Amino acid sequence: MSSGIIFFGTPEFAVPSLKALISRGEKILLVVTQPDKPKGRGKNLQAPEIKKVALQCGLPLCQPEKMKDDNFIKKLKSLNPEFAIVVAYGKILPKEILEIPKHGCINLHASLLPKYRGAAPIQWALINGEKITGVTTMIIDEGLDTGPILLQKEISINDEDNAETLSEKLSVVGAELIIETIDKMRKGIITPKPQTGEITYAPQLKKDDGKINWNNSARKIFNLVRGTYPWPCAYSFLKDERVKIIKTEVLEGNAAPGLIIKAKNELIVGTQEGLLRILLIQPEGKKIMTAKEFISGRKINEGMDSFS
């Protein structure tokens, strides 16, 4: 008889789901996470957040380099799991693995599928100015986030959210949805439903996706700033100095796109439509600072100098 869960996950987003399964007494047969990766200037190996939790809780752990490794697949089969739960694992599972668990491989995806299929649904929902997003549990098939839907939960996005804070919220709501999903599957009261409605995509962000185009509206730039924090961060150039724009707010008014119209105690910049007040900014190689701190160390000419 199949029993127990294999958990696939890697970053901080997956931690609440694993902890929720542990705290309610689920039998975790194995935790699968990505190999340790070099990080930072020293390129020191850093363990994924899920590995840290697994080690703290004394859970069996595996970090395969390849998904199609015969020994790894044999190990999974020998565990005879009831479920595999997949939360931001970061690799595509091959068909041989998808067929192992009794109830299939259940994925938690951070959007209301079929909207925002792909690797960066939280970021793109913010960049596109969505007011509502959510989480979906689904049965993984061989496509990219194309499998049948089990459950969904909506949450609203507010103007204070960025990709970091929204990820935290969705990870908690998602953990609750994972528990609800496995409970209902055990009772046989969920019918997987094919995805219907408009399909949109959320590809992995690249560094260049953060480049600010001041010919966009203030609201559009504001959304870009929120959606790209903490990585890759929205950025622009001032007198050939590259700066990251960390937090902003939209104001009414008009000025030429990119033109700095206030630079005494605050930093206000023109856009194609509306004005943008920069609240937090990060010069290259420096810490995040307030606009006032940034201004105090520079000579900026109001009405003459521009971001580009």
UniProtKB/Swiss-Prot annotation:
Catalytic function, reaction form: L-methionyl-tRNA(fMet) + (6R)-10-formyltetrahydrofolate = N-formyl-L-methionyl-tRNA(fMet) + (6S)-5,6,7,8-tetrahydrofolate + H(+)
EC number per UniProt: 2.1.2.9
Organism per entry: Thermodesulfovibrio yellowstonii (strain ATCC 51303 / DSM 11347 / YP87)
InterPro entries: Fmt, Formyl_trans_C, Formyl_transf_N, Formyl_transf_N_sf, Formyl_transferase-like_C_sf, Met-tRNA-FMT_C, Met-tRNA-FMT_N
Residues that bind (6S)-5,6,7,8-tetrahydrofolate: 111-114
Protein name: Methionyl-tRNA formyltransferase
GO annotation, cellular component aspect: cytosol
Domain of life: Bacteria
An example molecular function term from Gene Ontology annotations: methionyl-tRNA formyltransferase activity
Functional note: Attaches a formyl group to the free amino group of methionyl-tRNA(fMet). The formyl group appears to play a dual role in the initiator identity of N-formylmethionyl-tRNA by promoting its recognition by IF2 and preventing the misappropriation of this tRNA by the elongation apparatus.
Signal peptide interval: none
